[in-house]
Amino acid sequence: MTPNDTENAARPLPEGAVDPAQDAAGAPDTLAPAAQADAVAALEAEKLDLKNKLLRALADMENLRRRTEREVADARTYAVTNFARDMLNVADNVRRALDSVPVEDRAAADGALKALLDGIELTGRDLAKTLERHGVRAVEPQGQRFDPNLHQAMFEVPNPDVANGTVVQVVQTGYVIGDRVLRPALVGVSKGGPKAAEASKPAGEAPKPAGEAPKPAGDGQKPAEA
């Protein structure tokens, strides 16, 4: 400490004056209005950012929950897809065994042959019920409109009396599991007939030729003057 500092410290302050050292120590920590506004804006921006992050996290969790539920449901529904596809060959062979016996011979069968045919038919029904129990359904499109999502056209059958694009013969039964095609139905499709929209339209008055103007109520001639 220099002699001047000692002299200043010992010198009494004027009445009403405040010691600068005490004033600096006791003054509250205040910010200018502009600085306060900047701090509030920064806090608001941080709060908004955290809120957006929270909402995105909640949305991601909800999407994950739904996706997981869908995947679990699909796994439960389609877990037997490969096994069911292999069993379709068994169902086809059972049907072929029954179809190999003419209807009249099947009706006249008795004894061991009748028991054998009944057993094959019962096996086919039980197999179909078992497949249905696991979500596998047969597609029987006979008489329906051809759908490329469910059917596979093998040939065309000329038939002017049937709407064009109608399934007129089923070569092999199709199957679906859930909402997926397990095997498309092999079909024959009609051609040469009316279009489906025209075939479903009820018969009515023939349409007038385009551009024909309507006729007036009278004969269109000016009456003769008396």
From Swiss-Prot:
Localization terms from the record? Cytoplasm
Q: Which PROSITE patterns match?
A: GRPE
**Composition-biased stretches (Low complexity):** 192-218
The alphabetized UniProt keywords are: Chaperone, Cytoplasm, Stress response
Ribonucleoprotein found in the keyword field: no
Which GO biological process annotations does it have?
protein folding
Residue segments, region Disordered:
1-31, 189-226
Its Gene Ontology cellular component terms are: cytoplasm
- Name the Gene3D superfamilies for this protein: 3.90.20.20, Head domain of nucleotide exchange factor GrpE (2.30.22.10)
What InterPro entries has UniProt attached to this entry? GrpE, GrpE_coiled_coil, GrpE_head
Alphabetically, the GO molecular function entries are:
adenyl-nucleotide exchange factor activity; protein homodimerization activity; protein-folding chaperone binding; unfolded protein binding
The record describes the protein's role as: Participates actively in the response to hyperosmotic and heat shock by preventing the aggregation of stress-denatured proteins, in association with DnaK and GrpE. It is the nucleotide exchange factor for DnaK and may function as a thermosensor. Unfolded proteins bind initially to DnaJ; upon interaction with the DnaJ-bound protein, DnaK hydrolyzes its bound ATP, resulting in the formation of a stable complex. GrpE releases ADP from DnaK; ATP binding to DnaK triggers the release of the substrate protein, thus completing the reaction cycle.
In the record, the note on similarity to other proteins reads: Belongs to the GrpE family.
Q: Which NCBIfam families match?
A: PRK14140.1, PRK14141.1
Tell me, how does this one assemble?
Answer: Homodimer.
The protein here is known as Protein GrpE
